[in-house]
UniProtKB/Swiss-Prot annotation:
Self-association and partners: Homotetramer.
EC number: 2.7.1.40
Binding site for substrate: 33, 226-227, 259
Name of the protein: Pyruvate kinase
Amino acid sequence: MVGMMRKTKILVTLGPSLENKLDKAINLIDGVRFNMSHATTDYCEKFLNILEKNNIAKVMDLKGIKIRIKEVKLKNKILKMGEKVVIGEDIKLNYNIDTIEEGHFILINDGKIKLRVVEKTDKIIAVVEVGGEIKEGMGVNLPDTRIELPIIDETDLKNIKFAVEKDFEYIALSFVRNKEDVKELKDIISEYKGDCEVISKIETKEGLKNIKEIARESDGVMVARGDLGVEVPIENIPIEQKNILRIANRYGILSITATQILDSMINNPFPTRAEVTDIANAIYDGTDCLMLSNETTIGKYPIEAIKVLNKVAKVADEHYEEFGDRVCLEVESIDEGLVYAVYELYKKLNTKLVITPTYSGRTAKLISKLRINSKIIAPTPNIRTLKRLRLVWGVESCLMEEFDDMEKIINTCREMAKKEIGKGIYLITLGHPIGQKKTNTIKVESI
């Protein structure tokens, strides 16, 4: 059984800082992310054995569509406030600029440099509102502009094929604009005969606008606060985070909060008070999982950052019932309705444990969304489901080889209950008869 004391899960990004210390981190984490903006498939390959051996969830994060400065033709590459530049001449992008209109903002280097288009005739002229040094290769955000680029390119296709072949549990899609983007990735995964689940990264204005349709089509969403904080006013980030997480939980899908979780620990062995508070608030907003990025790729203290996240998450989890957001699931099926019955029984009977045998993991995810204080154990015959559930709040997944006989399943659950709680009331959820794809039964038992 996958042992854990905290309920909020931890996903780390693998990079130079952590790669030689992964063995020290392996018992502190639930998933590993490969950022394909920097990593290669050869790099991923080196770590697959240790991840498989420890049943760690693998997430491939596709590089996605990213606009960059292609060429700077200015003599002075330090832009000054009030200066005017011609986009496409003074500053060339790797993007067709025809869709940029007067009044649109052009944000460079994570929003540190800000231009506003003041004229569009045969040329696009922008005035510098916030200056700074610009270089070729810097990232560019166009928050007001509809980006007409394919969501997946040739490099992404090769990486998706690799992820399918190597049984990655999740593929994360960057800069998701609408449900069609999600469907495109799902179709490609199907063409490669894979079953990787799709995490949609919400990091653009268009993604925010279409968050409900994106969430319905996705297996999970990520609050990607880096680019999102460039695309929308930074003061709106807490509200957008709460909204994204609430919608994800309403639809019963995985939710991940990312970017600058412990940013100060890139260079310091201790977090700031604000970071600790941010972690707890993300948990109380309803996130399943917290993700470290630069902290574990280029940071000086990757293990320390992981340990801090563990400690803070554990304490926040203990107080979820006092301060956490109460999830309201969309009830559109029998199994969605059934989990509310689980919640009522939990409240009335003070149940200590819920055991939810599952093939796909869906019922375990739904029960997780209710944020009950009972332990949730999800036995499964499917190793992929076991690893996917590593990222789901409060769920402890384990293998159950005997999954074709109802009586054997129930007896195994009873043995688990004796081991886990010794005494007390517990629940078992089941799909009856065997092979039923929907959970439709709750057994209430006591020891």
